[in-house]
Curated annotation (Swiss-Prot):
Name this protein carries in UniProt: Polyribonucleotide nucleotidyltransferase
Reactions catalysed according to its record: RNA(n+1) + phosphate = RNA(n) + a ribonucleoside 5'-diphosphate
Domain KH: from-to ranges: 558-617
GO biological process, one term: RNA processing
Species of origin: Psychrobacter sp. (strain PRwf-1)
InterPro entries the record matches: ExoRNase_PH_dom1, ExoRNase_PH_dom2, ExoRNase_PH_dom2_sf, KH_dom, KH_dom_type_1, KH_dom_type_1_sf, NA-bd_OB-fold, PNPase
Keyword Iron in annotation: no
Length: 704
């Protein structure tokens, strides 16, 4: 009799066979083991039965981790252990978190930790979809009040057809990499990058992925039913009705007036004043035992009042917080070339959101090497997003990038990546950094706009300029409003926010987060149409400042050149033990890369360095010409003649009979090592041996 009570579900999902099982591994947690094709992921969920005293937020943590043993590899880091999370692990943790978080009831604050561990991988598929399915299943069999399950799907677009859960190899030829997650009836999350697809094609991919994942949702529901865990009885605490009425009656009008203040900092100050006044008026004596509880209730009621005030104003057709219409983009100010010694720079300002973006061009040695389950990845493009506390007028401790910064940086990267030139055409390593210097919503899309401008300012030949816009949606019953270029407050108080980046011809990145059910395909279609109009408006403004990439690379960037040599000459350029190429690098300061086919790529600090490196390489690889006179240096004297260096690394023999017209008894009477002489190439035999002569050659003659 087995000691394990294993329950499992097995089903076909696209081209992959999926098995979800529980009861065999990690039995002290709510755990499932997901096998999906060649990938296995263990997902464990721990749910605290009680909330911490005074807890006022939902402490949900998702950790996705890839173990190198899963692919039969030993980590390359110090100590040969997995270190801090990679960017892909961090992004996947966020990918799982986003569709799950909205499915817990309002007011639920028990701590939940989800750990997804990749324990086996065929290196042919990403494990994020399997991990998302596992997280949904583990939560569904737990006692947490989770309003799931959810499903997850990756969608590609290859040869005009949608492809479900494409492999890593298939994604290389796909015009789309889209991940969609949702419940039985609603899409909750979309994350994607695309090669200028239309709004209809993107929406079609979302709906296709949601339709295909229904089999996942059904099987997880059956698994949860078979396990039969009793869910926690949770009822969200109701707001004190009497206190709510007082706060609304006494301070509702003041809150509405505060939201008519367009300046963010002034508005926040006024709202804080009103909150303090409400606490003073309604919380009672600060020394009383009931004060702390009443203060917390008033703060919660006040936040609800702000939420309802903004939403009601939008749905009733009133101007937005800053006075704009629903589809109006904030005022734009665009500058390029603002930092004289960077390779490319742009200052993009949209209302109270501002990004200072720089581009740096590097050589092949600057490539970012990433150790992954699929092998070592050479990343030639990096986009880093920084969000300092001062950008929102706050103080705080600066440190390593947080998950949000990594996620926003990846979204901005997705927006511009498809428009980068091929590495064969433009071999530079590119690093873009977006410093958010002011923020009031949509900073990731400001980074997309700034990145496009900074890249073009640096002379990177983009296929087309890219702009991004953040959209929001407020919905109550049948009434809804789509908002273009949302503020921070509109982001927090809305039911859906989505970000769209693209060119004039199509979408390059789409991110969508939906907090409620009832967002139909018609609503999403309208939102995408409105986003398209906003994107074109921003692109037109950008094009007025810099319509295309500069025709030349910035003067401060490394100078680049390519030359071709005969593959037989590669060893001459490299030299014994690499001595020649090391000397070349030391002499010129250039970085020199040589391919097996004889292609040499040279990155010099400036044009002069590149030119000198080319000159020296051409001298090393030059072929001697029969009948041509060369100025050479005597390398070695022997009894039968002298070996003379006529080109770098190329020696020929002056036979004793070819030194002078008269008979020569001793070579050393005429020649010595280091002596410079003029010689004529008589012949080169089929073994490459060079015959030289001094006869009839004027020794004052210079090299031809």
């Amino acid at each position: 009799m087995s000691m394990f009570n294993t329950i499992s579900r097995e089903f076909q999902y696209g081209n992959e066979q999926v098995v979800i099982e529980t009861g065999r591994i990690a039995r002290q947690a709510n755990s499932v083991l997901v096998h999906m094709g060649g990938v296995s992921v263990l997902v464990a969920v721990v749910v605290k039965s009680d909330a911490k005293e005074g807890q006022n937020f939902f402490p949900l943590t998702v950790n996705y981790q890839e173990k190198m043993y899963a692919a039969g590899k030993i980590p390359g880091a110090y100590g040969k252990r997995e270190g801090r999370p990679t960017e892909f692990e961090t992004l996947t943790s966020r990918l799982i978190d986003r569709p799950i978080r909205p499915l817990f009831p309002e007011g639920y604050v028990n701590e939940i930790q989800i750990t997804a561990t990749v324990i086996s991988s065929d290196k042919k598929h990403y494990a994020d979809i399997a991990a998302m399915i596992g997280a949904s299943a583990a939560l569904s069999i737990s006692d947490a009040p989770f309003n799931g399950p959810i499903g997850g799907a990756r969608v590609g677009f290859i040869n005009g057809e949608y492809v479900l859960n494409p492999s890593i190899e298939e994604l290389k030829s796909s015009d789309l990499d889209l991940v969609v997650a949702g419940t039985k009836s609603a899409v909750l999350m979309v994350e994607s990058e695309a090669a200028e697809l239309s709004e209809d094609q993107m929406l079609g991919a979302v709906l296709y992925g949601h339709e295909q994942q229904q089999i996942v949702i059904d099987n997880i529901a059956e698994l949860a039913k078979a396990v039969g865990t009793q869910k926690q009885d949770f009822v969200a605490p109701e707001l004190n009705a009497e206190l709510k009425e007082k706060v609304t009656t006494q301070f509702g009008e003041q809150v509405a007036e505060a939201y008519a203040i367009s300046d963010k900092q002034a508005r926040y100050e006024k709202l804080d004043e009103i909150k303090a006044a409400a606490i003073d008026a309604l919380a009672g004596d600060p020394e009383s035992e009931e004060f702390a509880e009443k203060e917390a209730q008033i703060k919660e009621i006040y936040n609800d009042l702000k939420y309802r005030t903004v939403r009601d104003a939008i749905l009733s057709g009133k101007p937005r917080i800053d006075g704009r219409d629903l589809d109006t983009v904030r005022a734009l100010d665009i500058q390029v070339g603002v930092l004289p010694y960077t390779h490319g720079s742009a200052l993009f300002t949209r209302g109270e959101t501002q990004a200072l973006v720089t581009t740096t061009l590097g050589n092949s040695r600057d490539v970012n090497l990433i150790d992954s389950l699929a092998g070592t990845i050479q990343d030639h493009f990096m986009l880093h997003y920084n969000f300092p506390h001062y950008s929102v007028g706050e103080t705080g401790r600066e440190g390593v990038p947080k998950r949000r910064e990594i996620g926003h940086g990846r979204l901005a990267r997705r927006g511009v990546q498809a428009m980068l030139p091929d590495s064969d055409r433009f071999p530079y390593v590119i690093r873009v950094v977006s410093e958010i210097t002011e923020s009031n919503g949509s900073s990731s899309m400001a980074s997309v706009c700034g990145a496009s401008l900074a890249l073009m300012d640096a002379g990177v030949p983009l296929k087309a300029p890219v702009a991004g816009i953040a959209m929001g949606l407020v919905k109550e019953g049948d009434r809804f409003a789509v908002l273009s270029d949302i503020l921070g407050d509109e982001d927090h108080l809305g039911d859906m926010d989505f970000k769209v980046a693209g060119t004039k011809d199509g979408i390059t990145a789409l991110q969508m987060d939906i907090k409620i059910e009832g967002i139909t395909s018609d609503i999403m279609e309208k939102a995408l149409e409105q986003a398209h109009a906003g994107r074109i408006h921003i692109l037109n403004a950008m094009n007025e400042v810099l319509p295309a990439s500069r025709t030349e690379i910035n003067a401060h960037a490394p100078n680049y050149a390519v030359i071709e040599i005969n593959s037989d000459k590669i060893r001459d350029v490299i030299g014994k033990g690499g001595a020649t190429i090391r000397q070349l690098t030391e002499d010129t300061g250039a970085v020199i890369d040589i391919d097996d086919n004889g292609t040499i790529r040279i990155f010099g600090e400036n044009k002069a360095a590149t030119k000198e490196a080319i000159r020296q390489i051409e001298a090393i690889t030059a072929e001697v010409e029969v009948g041509k006179v060369y100025k050479g240096t005597v390398a070695r004297v022997v009894d039968f003649g002298a070996f003379v260096t006529v080109l770098p690394g190329t020696d020929g023999l002056v036979h004793i009979s070819q030194i002078a017209d008269e008979r020569v008894e001793s070579v050393s009477d005429y020649l010595s090592e280091g002596q410079q002489i003029n010689v004529l190439v008589q012949d080169v035999d089929n073994r490459g041996r060079i015959k030289l002569t001094m006869k009839g050659v004027e020794q004052e003659q210079t090299q031809a």
